[in-house]
């Protein structure tokens, strides 16, 4: 995807996760490249030519799944496609949020733009117009087994193109036809192959995966910031992060985390104040942070690599090779790559939360904190300080341990045994979102407690990264003098993390973290 003034040009093969976020969250409008539209025209012309002959082609002149051998007469091929959307719209549960639906629209347009799916240009153009004009289909979050792709969610998405289903426009949920009309658009009547082309793919799980990877990459850096602040507040040592030490075990993520921790704690008067103390080494949750954070960062990088490929892949079936005159039936719709990556992502985030909660315990427990008051309150007894904040972190970490169980190892056959291995990719992606939400809050609790602890250390200043982190948090959350409703403070820190403000301020002072 290329930036053209204030637009992003969609060509089917160069979409980045940052581009997706800009469209899904930031509302950046999209155009189709002329080259992509030409490829789509050629692909469609080939499908039209097939219809003039007597060839049997799956999904064009046959039924679907178990009904693969049922021949469909030429007069019914268009009704076949609409029937497919209606029967596949079997999703249940809460609808996906707006940014997820926008990401789904974008990804479906991107895969169709490569010109291997046989849709008409006007069908693809309507998909893009819906995205640009804010027509967001109501898509239930449950119902996909991850092969053939995300059929149920994408069917709910695609129904709106035909005037069916429901969509949100300007905050109001309307019937599909009314939603299109509100945006100045008209529904289409599906042509041969188009229903299948619109719903056969991994765009629901991939949309969630891309958005979660983007958050996870930021959380990995914020986990390093939280650790740095806790290290300084508990009078820990930087020696376990030295470059020559980490060169002996050169995992990329470990190297990055160690460098970040050194940068964030640079020029720390707190660390310098106890340079000659008799403590030999810190607890694992501090000393081994690069090894644990780094392993999670490497896992996040793996997931990001899978997602980067998937969002620029063609995941339809069958695929139309107009240049060679072939229609190839295969399995690009199978979500196993995204399912496995999502499970790995959830495990990585669960571990970031796990070790963060242990550091929070070291902050609030006077037996571990090297001189800080119990629960970080100077009036313990009358006030309980951050006692129960650690309970909340423990609860979220426990929930993550359940959710970290992989979904991709499960498979339940469907379509009367024809589709006898499925990925459960959307289940994996949805779990990863919840784990990410929990992880964000666990790290927010550590940051909140670390800020309080740094205040309690008095006039000794922390390192340059920790110092900025403290300043940003204090601008939103005041020092805890007496008990107040803690959940509000946690959510304020979460907001600083989620909107990028905290990380941006720290990186402005320290340079870009790894």
From Swiss-Prot:
Keyword presence, Flavoprotein: no
Modified residues (2,3-didehydroalanine (Ser)): 148
This protein's UniProt keywords: Cytoplasm, Histidine metabolism, Lyase
UniProt-listed Gene3D superfamilies: Fumarase/aspartase (Central domain), Fumarase/aspartase (N-terminal domain)
SUPFAM superfamilies xref list: L-aspartase-like
Domain of life: Bacteria
Family: Belongs to the PAL/histidase family.
Protein name as annotated: Histidine ammonia-lyase
Organism: Gloeobacter violaceus (strain ATCC 29082 / PCC 7421)
């Amino acid at each position: 995807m290329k930036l053209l003034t204030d637009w992003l040009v969609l060509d089917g093969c160069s979409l980045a996760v940052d581009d997706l976020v800009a469209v899904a969250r930031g509302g950046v409008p999209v155009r189709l490249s002329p080259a992509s539209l030409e490829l789509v025209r050629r692909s469609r012309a080939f499908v039209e030519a097939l219809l003039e002959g007597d060839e049997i082609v799956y999904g064009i002149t046959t039924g679907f799944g178990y009904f693969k051998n049922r021949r469909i007469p030429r007069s019914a091929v268009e009704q076949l496609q609409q029937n497919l959307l209606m029967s596949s719209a079997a999703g249940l549960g809460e609808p996906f949020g707006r940014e997820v639906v926008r990401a789904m629209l974008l990804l479906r347009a991107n895969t169709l733009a490569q010109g291997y799916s046989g849709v008409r240009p006007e069908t693809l153009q309507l998909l893009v117009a819906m995205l640009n004009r804010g027509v967001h289909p109501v898509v239930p979050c449950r119902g996909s087994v991850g092969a053939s792709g995300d059929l149920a969610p994408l069917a709910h998405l695609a129904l709106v193109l035909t005037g069916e289903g429901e969509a949100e426009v300007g905050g109001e949920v309307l019937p599909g036809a009314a939603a299109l009309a509100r945006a100045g658009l008209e529904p289409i009547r599906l042509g041969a192959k188009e229903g299948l082309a619109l719903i056969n793919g991994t765009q629901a799980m991939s949309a969630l995966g891309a958005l979660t990877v983007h958050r996870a990459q930021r959380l990995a850096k914020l986990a390093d910031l939280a650790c740095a602040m806790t290290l300084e507040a508990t009078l820990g040592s930087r020696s376990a992060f030295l470059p020559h030490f980490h060169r002996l075990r050169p995992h990329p993520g470990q190297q990055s985390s160690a460098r970040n921790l050194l940068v964030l704690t640079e020029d720390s008067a707190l660390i310098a104040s106890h340079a000659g103390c008799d403590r030999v080494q810190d607890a694992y949750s501090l000393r081994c942070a690069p090894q644990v954070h780094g392993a999670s960062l490497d896992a996040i990088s793996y997931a990001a690599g899978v997602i980067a490929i998937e969002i620029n892949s063609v995941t339809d079936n069958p695929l139309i090779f107009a240049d060679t005159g072939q229609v190839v039936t295969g399995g690009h719709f199978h979500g196993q790559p995204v399912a496995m990556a999502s499970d790995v992502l959830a495990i990585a985030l669960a571990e970031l939360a796990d070790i963060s909660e242990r550091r929070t315990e070291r902050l609030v427990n006077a037996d571990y904190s090297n001189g800080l008051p119990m629960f970080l309150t100077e009036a313990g007894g009358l006030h309980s300080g951050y006692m129960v904040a650690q309970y909340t972190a423990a609860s979220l970490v426990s929930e993550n341990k359940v959710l970290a169980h992989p979904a991709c190892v499960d498979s339940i056959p469907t379509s009367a045994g024809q589709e006898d291995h499925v990925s459960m990719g959307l289940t994996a992606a949805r779990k990863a979102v919840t784990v990410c939400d929990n992880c964000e809050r666990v790290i927010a609790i550590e940051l909140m407690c670390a800020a309080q602890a740094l205040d309690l250390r008095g006039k000794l200043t922390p390192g340059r990264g920790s110092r900025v982190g403290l300043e940003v948090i204090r601008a939103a959350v005041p020092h805890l003098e007496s008990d107040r409703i803690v959940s509000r403070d946690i959510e304020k820190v979460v907001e600083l993390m989620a909107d990028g403000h905290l990380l941006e301020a720290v990186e402005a002072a320290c340079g870009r973290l790894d």
